[in-house]
């Protein structure tokens, strides 16, 4: 009897430790459903139906492994990826890494901020500039939670992630995608033409996010409670749950666009405003409103995460710290410039996702090197299959980027 009570008590304690350690992956996962994903997935679904769903599946599986490695680095070493690069690489390389990481973070934030502004515009009927002002105010308010510690922010961002997921369950109900072709698109790889490869690279850039590779290792480097092994096991569950939700949302975005647009003859839908206007008569006003609200939720939460990632990058690489409010104010400026110049915001979103894919390999290579170093990682060092899989992912990313460069120069993509 006593033995049974002790076992139950230790089991409850283990569950409490696991629950207490959950959260960082939900912050990282929000970067995987930002407005850039909306733009890229809608364009891919409208243009090619279900044919590129398999790209989302494989990109999400890659992202799961990458986020586990990033989180593991923080747990094993007590330092984030940027700090490890600073400690192990020559100063010129560190400065190069810092500059490119800041550019990637700014490109990401541009997509996220403008996406939220578009969402406010669609839902409230305000101008894009007014939507940008609302986005700025809302993100400042969310960032204020950071003063109370990491957990309150994790809960708010996790709640927004779940809201977007529920919103897309509703969108799937409205759009009613055909199961047979959807299943075929999930499991059979196909790239019909050069535009499909360009969009596939965009989907990859939208799904695997360089800035959250840096951020996740920072979120786990100060985790407390349980043994190191318990923290790692809890983190794997955290990543599995959060990234499964993010993967579902990305698949649902593309499937909804395919069902609502592609198979109703609207194959040219590549604009978030156009998607909203087209959804209303095709499905319903409610479906269009839910789309707009999910865009706001994704944009606000992901732009907050982008601001945090930028802070981690600066502190990690060059040991320089600026207040979060100042960073938020500075990184809003490119978005306002794009809006005031009247540039096509959706085109900016899609191009930013392609740009992001160029930063993936630069973050992945040192991550793989460090997590494969037994002296650094101890018993959490990568196994052989993880190392091989990681380098295959790097090869795929570099190959896609090479094709993009050649294709763009030759006018193929």
Curated annotation (Swiss-Prot):
GO MF assignments: cadmium ion transmembrane transporter activity; manganese ion transmembrane transporter activity; metal ion binding; symporter activity
Topology of the protein relative to the lipid bilayer: Multi-pass membrane protein
Main location: membrane
TM ranges: 19-39, 46-66, 94-114, 122-142, 156-176, 196-216, 241-261, 290-310, 329-349, 350-370, 392-412
One cellular component (GO) term of this entry: plasma membrane
Pfam families referenced in this protein's UniProt entry, alphabetically: Nramp
Subcellular compartments: Cell inner membrane
Annotated keywords: Cell inner membrane, Cell membrane, Ion transport, Membrane, Symport, Transmembrane, Transmembrane helix, Transport
Function field: H(+)-stimulated, divalent metal cation uptake system.
Family indicated by similarity: Belongs to the NRAMP family.
Record's protein name: Divalent metal cation transporter MntH
């Amino acid at each position: 009897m006593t033995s049974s009570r002790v076992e139950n008590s230790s089991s409850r304690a283990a569950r409490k430790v696991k629950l207490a350690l959950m959260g960082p992956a939900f912050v990282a996962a929000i970067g995987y459903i930002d407005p850039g994903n909306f733009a890229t997935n809608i364009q891919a679904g409208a243009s090619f139906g279900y044919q590129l769903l398999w790209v989302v599946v494989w990109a999400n599986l890659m992202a799961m492994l990458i986020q586990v490695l990033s989180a593991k680095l923080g747990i094993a070493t007590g330092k984030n990826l940027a700090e490890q690069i600073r400690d192990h690489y020559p100063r010129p390389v560190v400065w190069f890494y810092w500059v490119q990481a800041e550019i990637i973070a700014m490109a990401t934030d541009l997509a996220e901020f403008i996406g939220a502004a578009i969402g406010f515009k669609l839902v409230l009927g305000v101008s894009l500039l007014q939507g940008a002002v609302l986005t700025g105010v809302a993100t400042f308010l969310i960032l204020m939670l950071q003063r109370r510690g990491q957990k309150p922010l994790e809960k708010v961002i996790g709640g927004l992630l779940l809201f977007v997921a529920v919103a897309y369950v509703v969108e799937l109900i409205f759009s009613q995608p055909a199961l047979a072709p959807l299943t075929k698109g999930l499991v059979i790889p196909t790239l019909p033409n050069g535009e499909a490869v360009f969009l596939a690279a965009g989907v990859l850039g939208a799904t695997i996010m360089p800035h959250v590779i840096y951020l996740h290792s920072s979120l786990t480097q100060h985790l407390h409670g349980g043994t190191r092994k318990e923290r790692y096991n809890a983190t794997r569950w955290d990543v599995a749950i959060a990234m499964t939700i993010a993967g579902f949302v990305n698949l649902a975005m593309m499937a909804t666009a395919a069902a609502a647009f592609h198979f109703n003859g609207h194959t040219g839908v590549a604009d978030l405003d156009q998607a909203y206007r087209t959804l209303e008569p095709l499905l319903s006003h409610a479906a269009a409103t839910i789309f707009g609200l999910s865009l706001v939720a994704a944009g606000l939460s992901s732009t907050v995460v982008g601001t945090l990632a930028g802070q981690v990058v600066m502190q990690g690489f060059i040991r320089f710290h600026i207040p979060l409010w100042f960073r938020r104010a500075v990184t809003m400026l490119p978005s306002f410039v794009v809006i005031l110049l009247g540039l096509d915001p959706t085109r900016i979103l899609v191009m930013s996702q392609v740009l992001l894919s160029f930063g993936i390999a630069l973050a992945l290579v040192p991550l793989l090197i460090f997590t494969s170093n037994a002296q650094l990682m101890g018993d959490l060092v990568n196994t052989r299959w993880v190392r091989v899989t990681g380098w295959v992912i790097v090869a795929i990313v570099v190959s896609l980027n090479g094709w993009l460069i050649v294709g763009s120069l030759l006018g193929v993509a």
